[in-house]
């Protein structure tokens, strides 16, 4: 039982390290998103789309890391050898890691929502630019018609 407990402690330490690594990676993605919202005002639509794609790749990488940590915690949770005493010990050892992992799921969802909003901003900006171009094109066409004395038909 003691050997099994020591093994569980080692797996719990590894799980904590992997949770911390995933937490740092997710924090960097969140910081990247904070920078994006500031860049949205001054960036062109094509730059915004490129930034969104770059951020999407970072989010997917962080999500894969979180999923890997979840699998690591699941394997560590299963290392109790069928003993109820060890099972309770495993649950206690991994409780904080599981709680942090659940918070990470909501953080990933929040970052994905922020990215979705950023993309919507890019689409609105594109629509506004197209509206300005349409108005300018209509003005040019009417000026040309007036200069050449053409009718609307």
Per-region residue spans from a language model:
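Extended alpha-helical scaffold segments
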Residues: 1-153
